[in-house]
Amino acid sequence: SILSVIFIFTSHKDFHIEDYNAAKKEGFIAPDYKVFWGHEDEILYKRAKKQLEQLSSSDKPFNLTMLTVDTHFPRGYKCRLCKDKYNRQYANVIACADQQIYDFVEWIKKQDFYKNTTIVIAGDHTTMVDTSDPIWSNLNNNYKRTVYNTIINADCTYKENVTENRDFSTMDMFPTTLAALGVQIDGNRLGLGTNLFSGQKTLPEKLGRGYINQELKKNDKEYNGFY
């Protein structure tokens, strides 16, 4: 949930959260403006550019984390930038979102700070639109739905083949992201995750997803007590 995300950031170091209410205070949107979850991703990218310009103006390392929502269930939000290329709103929203993130990344690449900045694009889950929906009609029945992840301008050395056709999970993104930032990880494992750049087998590759899922479903009162 959004509240869980806020808790994670507010309980770790000194994150400054720029939310919907901040957008109104800063004049990006009118006081009574609200669409979908608050405001569309077009405004998010405008705000992000301003934040990046401010953050990169100092010599200190910085982190900017963004959450896009235009493609969220059930049909996504069709903003003014979206074209009617397809006969389904959701398909048009996805195409529009793809173009916006592409334009944003290309903008970053033109900035001076890009040379020592790593970009991580990560999905939190596959789309929640039911597979019986007509939007999937052009896909083969054997098509395997996956979460989109990519890392651009990683600050680590690796062999190209270790990033291809891997069986991994969200847990592996933790050490992989840190490795992409130049962090040296002893053993290339953190928690249940494996640094994908290392070429070492992930737990799904080593033990199989069936076993991993079975073990993760086990209950532990002490562990649950932390939450």
Predicted regions and their residues:
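Solvent-exposed soluble domains appended to multi-pass membrane proteins
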Residues: 1-227
